[in-house]
Amino acid sequence: MLKKTITYTDYNGMERTEDFYFHLSKAELMEMEMSTTGGMEAYVEKIVNAQDAPAIVQTFKELILKAYGEKSLDGKRFEKSPEKADAFAQTEAYSELF
């Protein structure tokens, strides 16, 4: 799990510093690897070598949003959902990270 502290200005003009969490489980990594022709590592290498900016940006965005989540209060779960990822993507913290 990666904890990233991000300082950003919210839409009320208030500067905020918050911790955000990102994690891809072994199962998620395996799924990404197996669902990408030739594997995820080879795909990333290919688009970087080709300097395919649109594909690089799209892949980076997908990785960030797929990894974003919130730790449960008891620390036993890392809670993810499309709604949580979408809410994060609508913040200036996401823009700062991106």
Give residue ranges: language-model regions.
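Short, charged/polar N-terminal "headpieces" of proteins
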Residues: 1-43
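Acidic, low-complexity intrinsically disordered segments
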Residues: 41-98
